[in-house]
């Protein structure tokens, strides 16, 4: 145990000075070190800080018993070879807790010295970069050697870990092979990966067996006229009665919450067998259709945004709308208000970025009579009072000062305001919708927005996609503009294709400006009679806009384009549910996530 890692100096410079020579470190390790530093993990830990008591470990083992009983035999088969190579093998659950370990006595002895034992929590946030915690975080096999570990507790160890997934792509746990650094073996990672793959197949087979047994127990209920479903432990539907099969043909594998979205409520729940639950349902009256006084296109991004708006409108939670200038944040905020229980109350919009800092306080909180020279005789009601029993929309929330953030936080916490110059607190009953063209989380991380205020406002974030990411909606937007302005315009296909290629930095607002120019220039709407250059000139677009916009990150191969198109269709079919989309695509969820990042897609794509 006295080997000295080659890159110890790299580690020392990073933990002491925050300087990292990334050329000397693998990308995955560098990313993990940055995560650890951000999470304030102690790099000088000499042993694992958290080990469960036996009763807690028993509870944890029971919670993950299906994973443990399925994967442990593979660990036991591996042991003779592991012991011969003076290593140890471990099974870790999805929470990062060591459930089982065995191996060579010397390895076990050294492991005990750093609390690397059953019941230890070995996540990145607990002990820094390590094969187990990093594999859990990135959901990929990984090997960590010597001082690549973030905490010194593991600097004299070499570890290789591979994640084990359930059939739906969710993480079941990790298998790890570790040894003192001096006894490293070149095939450690390969062995761990092979065992993880075998355990995954066994988990999938046993899950299917378990589900078949549950379906058998569900029995005649499947032919019943009473709406009911059989769900597994993750509340995915594995069998259903006739009313559900009829109303939801794609019921298999769907999540229980999707039935709630379709108007069903749970009347009763009965346990069936090991891990099965039969939910008896009743169909609720259809709710009023969601009204949106704008236009929602048919693209996946637009439909996903509408779904999130509809969900948020049904609650009274604070909503944070984010999107570039011109994406329609105020229109979305009004839609939330008009479809909520507060729709009969006032909707008050305040642009925090347009009000001088010395006036924002009186604009929001109002002032009492005689509060200052020039004050109105009877005082002034601020936005919070005006919005009482309704909705207050705070646009460009990232522009308010820190002192105003403190005052705003207090109102959000206590639901009371005190006007400037006033002495009495006034209760207010409001819903707050905030909006920003920036990333609010990034503003909080950079200290521009207080973290406590961020968590108050960022309860249900909704991103409004830029027009360049949903150009297939342009024909719908054109039709909306025509109807709203009573203009009989037509949209030539070649001109529409050029509009789809434009980058639209001003988003929908810029697009509508183009439509307005065209309606003024061609009041009869006969755009098809005009040449493409004439239309571009009338629209105020440069002739070069007919050229294709540059690819964001390089040209995709034919195969990659097919993969991307399939993923978009799967996400649309699954309504943004990544696990379901991965299942539809027939690929593991971890791979699906990697491709989301690769193709710059989001769950709302």
Curated annotation (Swiss-Prot):
It holds the Pfam family HTH_8. InterPro entries: AAA+_ATPase, GAF, GAF-like_dom_sf, Homeodomain-like_sf, HTH_Fis, P-loop_NTPase, Sigma_54_int, Sigma_54_int_dom_CS. Residues 295-520 form the Sigma-54 factor interaction domain. Residues 578-597 bind DNA. The gene is acoR. GO terms for cellular component: protein-DNA complex. PROSITE patterns: SIGMA54_INTERACT_3, SIGMA54_INTERACT_4. GO terms for molecular function: ATP binding; ATP hydrolysis activity; cis-regulatory region sequence-specific DNA binding; DNA-binding transcription activator activity. The keyword Transmembrane does not apply. This is Acetoin dehydrogenase operon transcriptional activator AcoR.
